[in-house]
Amino acid sequence: MQVNISGHQLDVTDALRDYVEEKISRLERHFDRITSVQVIMTVEKLKQKIEATLHVSGAEVVANAEHEDMYAAIDLLADKLDRQLIKHKEKQIERQQGQRPADSPVP
């Protein structure tokens, strides 16, 4: 998985980078087909904003979060992405189960 982290009006420190990478790597326990991740952190007045785009097999998962503290915003973002990935995985499973032929023939 390729992780690209950038900051707008913000210097991305090693501590921030490590924290984001740790949170993103935890997402793989639910969905292991994440190919790349784009994370953009911005500062606007008193708000810390973070946006992430995950490229997964067959789709893109996008989430945004904002908070007064960047670390709290990262936590919120990770929670949102976690829920979205679980939902995406469930949809994929439903599609696969719907495509299988029925066990018994229809009369």
From Swiss-Prot:
Q: Which residues cross the membrane?
A: none
What the entry lists under InterPro entries is as follows:
HPF/YfiA_ribosome-assoc, RHF-like, RHF/RaiA
| Pfam families in the record | Ribosomal_S30AE
Query: Carries keyword DNA damage?
Result: no
SUPFAM superfamilies (UniProt xref): Ribosome binding protein Y (YfiA homologue)
Give the superkingdom in one word.
Answer: Bacteria
One GO process term, biological-process aspect: negative regulation of translational elongation
Arranged from A to Z, the UniProt key words for this protein are: Translation regulation
Which GO molecular function annotation, any one, does this entry have? ribosomal small subunit binding
The protein's matches in Gene3D superfamilies, at most eight in alphabetical order, are given as: Ribosome hibernation promotion factor-like
User: What GO cellular component entries does it have?
Assistant: cytosolic small ribosomal subunit
Function summary: During stationary phase, promotes and stabilizes dimerization of 70S ribosomes by the ribosome modulation factor (RMF), leading to the formation of inactive 100S ribosomes.
Task: Write out the similarity annotation.
Answer: Belongs to the HPF/YfiA ribosome-associated protein family. Short HPF subfamily.
Protein's name according to its UniProt entry: Ribosome hibernation promoting factor
